[in-house]
């Protein structure tokens, strides 16, 4: 791979053959969800960890069988922190600060607690959370009791499973994202340290957007259609201001992309990101919850070099026609379950549109979305099915559970 790609990040399409991907192994963080708190952590039900791991392993094996190299976010962070005691201590302090621990005694106990763990176990524990009962000798303040969690000193991070969102690969660079929900913001510390300190990634990876921005941006809303064209969703989790900031950064730094299409979709739990209702699966084929244009308002952002300003216009054409125009080819859109009112809504809810392309016309999909998967195959798409009785409880499909790092150029 080093011979083929000079940069550790190489994403210039959604469908080029996938060569390298970032995942997270489901861990004990899922066991720390309870019925009372699961909604706060963006889960609609409690996954059974044993089966979730089995389902995820099927996903991993399909990727490996198709010669995809797999990196794990927890491994990369551990490698960074194992390289320097000073860096490990800095990370611990930042992690505790961003967990909003305010009492000095609790801060000091947590620093000792994490410092005495091996790096691997420390990272795992930071993700799974630290329960109050684990710090038996800790004296909590009134503020800790009143404003903190009754169960955890450090909350679990079950959404680390969805590696698509905390950062996103665009061209040879990345966005380290400002997450919309407070419960997910600590996830991006991992990306910050990987791309600032890891020997494989700290060089030659420009950062187009950073985690301290005021407006939110999440990877489920970021799409690279080709070397000229991006699509960014404006959704429940990504704000319009972030699209403008990202565009300004890309144009200022002379990234190759000349046009950004901003797709505004309804702010709705079922459509939290654009990739829950829309993905590309072949050169000329997309899947969408619906082709009804009431769901999409489209804006075009381009750069005017003469005025040094970003031009923004509202696109009046329909979704299919907009895609056809900017991609220069006729486009087909396969609707979830063919647009059936019952099956379409059910399968979109279970991530029928959230498939991961591993090559042009070849995707990984949840097996439960049988109507949509059959339509894919009838339209010449090769479908690799994975079980999802537990993985789907977090409302994320194969694209959500993966961040593409390297794809073949097309």
UniProtKB/Swiss-Prot annotation:
Family membership, please give it. Belongs to the arginine deiminase family.
Q: Which HAMAP family match?
A: Arg_deiminase
What pathway is this protein a component of? Answer: Amino-acid degradation; L-arginine degradation via ADI pathway; carbamoyl phosphate from L-arginine: step 1/2
- GO CC annotations, alphabetized: cytoplasm
Q: What is its EC number?
A: 3.5.3.6
Keywords tagged on the record? Arginine metabolism, Cytoplasm, Hydrolase
From the Swiss-Prot or TrEMBL record, state where the protein is found.
Answer: Cytoplasm
Q: What is this protein called?
A: Arginine deiminase
PANTHER family, A to Z: ARGININE DEIMINASE
**Catalytic reaction equation(s):** L-arginine + H2O = L-citrulline + NH4(+)
Which GO biological process annotations does it have?
arginine catabolic process to ornithine; arginine deiminase pathway
Task: Enumerate the InterPro entries for this protein.
Answer: Arg_deiminase
Give the active-site positions: 400 (amidino-cysteine intermediate)
Give the source's domain of life in one word.
Bacteria
What does the record give under GO molecular function?
arginine deiminase activity
**Keyword match Cytoplasm:** yes
Question: Key word Cytoplasm present in the record?
Answer: yes
Signal sequence region: none
Q: Per the UniProt entry, what species is this protein from, by scientific name?
A: Borreliella burgdorferi (strain ATCC 35210 / DSM 4680 / CIP 102532 / B31)
């Amino acid at each position: 791979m080093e011979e083929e790609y000079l940069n550790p990040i190489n994403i210039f399409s959604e469908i080029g053959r996938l060569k390298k991907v970032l995942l997270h192994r489901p861990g004990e963080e899922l066991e720390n969800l309870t019925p009372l708190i699961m909604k706060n952590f963006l889960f609609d039900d409690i996954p059974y960890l044993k089966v979730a791991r089995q389902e995820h392993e099927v996903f991993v094996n399909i990727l490996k069988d198709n010669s995809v190299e797999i990196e794990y976010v927890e491994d990369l962070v551990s490698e960074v922190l194992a390289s320097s005691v000073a860096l490990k201590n800095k990370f611990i302090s930042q992690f505790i600060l961003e967990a909003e621990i305010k009492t000095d005694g609790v801060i000091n106990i947590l620093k000792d607690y994490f410092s005495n763990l091996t790096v691997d176990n420390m990272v795992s524990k930071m993700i799974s959370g630290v329960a109050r009962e684990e710090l038996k000798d800790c004296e909590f303040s009134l503020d800790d009791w009143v404003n903190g969690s009754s169960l955890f000193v450090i909350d679990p991070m079950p959404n680390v499973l969805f590696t698509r969102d905390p950062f996103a690969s665009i061209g040879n660079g990345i966005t380290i994202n400002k997450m919309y929900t407070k419960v997910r913001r600590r996830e991006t510390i991992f990306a910050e340290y990987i791309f600032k300190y890891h020997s494989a990634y700290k060089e030659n990876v420009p950062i187009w957007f950073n985690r301290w921005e005021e407006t939110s941006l999440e990877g489920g809303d970021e799409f690279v259609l080709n070397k000229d064209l991006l699509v960014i969703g404006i959704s429940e989790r990504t704000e319009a201001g972030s699209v403008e900031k990202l565009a300004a950064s890309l144009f200022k730094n002379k990234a190759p992309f000349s046009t950004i299409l901003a797709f505004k979709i309804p702010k709705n739990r079922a459509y939290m990101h654009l990739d829950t209702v829309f993905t590309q699966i072949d050169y000329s084929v997309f899947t969408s919850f619906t082709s009804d244009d009431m769901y999409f308002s489209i804006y075009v952002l381009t750069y005017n070099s003469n005025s040094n300003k970003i031009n923004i216009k509202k696109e009046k054409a329909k979704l299919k026609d907009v895609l056809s125009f900017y991609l220069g080819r006729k486009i087909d859109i396969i609707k979830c379950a063919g647009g059936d009112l019952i099956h379409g809504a059910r399968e979109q809810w279970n991530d029928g549109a959230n498939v991961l392309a591993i090559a042009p016309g070849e995707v990984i999909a949840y097996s439960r979305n049988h109507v949509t998967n059959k339509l894919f195959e009838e339209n010449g798409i090769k479908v690799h099915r994975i079980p999802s009785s537990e993985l789907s409880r977090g409302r994320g499909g194969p694209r959500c559970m993966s961040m593409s790092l390297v794809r073949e150029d097309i």
